[in-house]
Amino acid sequence: MKLTKMDQRILNQIQHNSRISNQDLAQKIGLSASPCLRRVRQLEQEGYIDSYIARLNEQKLKLKLIALIQISMDRHTPERFENFEGIVKHYEEVLECFLITGQNADYLLKVIVPDMEYYQDFLLGKLTRIEGVTGVQSSFIMRKVIDKTALPLAHL
């Protein structure tokens, strides 16, 4: 499926407000309600719309410490990577995990926890106990400068 300009407008509206009603969406993009709903359903079926989620307030939930953690592994084998990834994907504190290159690390994790004491327990009780982890370097977020979830669509 090739995305049309109308599809791009739909995606742009939905990624900024996933709770928008079909009627409001249709009005904003200049389409009647039925064709708008058909297009949204098609975008969902084609996988362009992955999910609809609520973005929770970290501060209200007392999640005040965000860490970017570089992880070094002892061996660069598919089995070692599969083991690590299989374990960290179950840690609710891990928001994102990237296999990286160009650094002295193999993985970059984005982790959110309530405080430094919790972070220490997470680091020593979970991360460093994973087989193959040989190094951990943490950086802590002082302030979010840009915090958005909307993907750029202008290139389409």
What is the meaning of each model-derived region?
Residues 1-156:
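A compositional/biophysical signature of low hydrophobicity enriched in polar/charged and small residues
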